[in-house]
């Protein structure tokens, strides 16, 4: 009688067993696909931020050279803002995506860039497109 009961238990419990196995297979497949999708998203987002930071750096270095050649008292305030932007860019953690204040520092850099553009009376239009990124005036 005990053998018959074990056979019936296997039949009755098959639904639960198949449900558990299906759940486990789905979980493993979803986890691996999630890792791939997360990696792809991180690469795209990191490339956009890198392009933006590179554009700010090039902009700041170009204006540093331009303002240095015609250093007058009027340009001293502009030069201080350029130097502050360059300092922020140099301190930015390019190789640490887990840095706690990454977004705060990025917002600070963007604010300093806007301040510099205002002082220079320049209207930047930074765009990241599939064909590349650019800063237009």
UniProtKB/Swiss-Prot annotation:
Pfam families: Yae1_N (PF09811). InterPro entries: Essential_protein_Yae1_N, LTO1_adapter. It is found in: Nucleus. Residues 22-58 are annotated as: deca-GX3 motif. GO terms for biological process: protein maturation; ribosomal large subunit biogenesis; translational initiation. The modification N-acetylalanine is found at residue 2. Keywords: Acetylation, Nucleus. One of its GO terms (cellular component) is nucleus. The keyword Coiled coil does not apply. The complex LTO1:YAE1 functions as a target specific adapter that probably recruits apo-ABCE1 to the cytosolic iron-sulfur protein assembly (CIA) complex machinery. May be required for biogenesis of the large ribosomal subunit and initiation of translation. May play a role in the regulation of proline metabolism and ROS production. Belongs to the LTO1 family. Forms a complex with YAE1. Interacts with PYCR1 and PYCR2. This is Protein LTO1 homolog. It comes from Mus musculus.
């Amino acid at each position: 009688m005990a053998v018959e009961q074990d056979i019936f238990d296997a039949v009755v419990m098959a639904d639960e067993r198949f449900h558990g196995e299906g759940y486990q297979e789905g979980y493993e497949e979803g986890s691996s696909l999630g890792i791939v999708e997360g990696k792809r998203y991180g690469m795209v987002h990191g490339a956009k931020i890198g392009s933006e930071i590179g554009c700010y750096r090039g902009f700041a270095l170009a204006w540093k050279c331009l303002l240095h050649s015609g250093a007058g008292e009027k340009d001293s305030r502009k030069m201080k803002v350029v130097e502050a932007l360059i300092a922020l860019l140099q301190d930015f953690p390019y190789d640490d995506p887990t840095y706690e204040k990454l977004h705060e520092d990025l917002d600070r850099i963007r604010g300093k860039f806007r301040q510099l553009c205002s002082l220079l009376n320049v209207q930047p239009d930074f765009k990241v497109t599939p064909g590349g990124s650019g800063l237009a005036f």
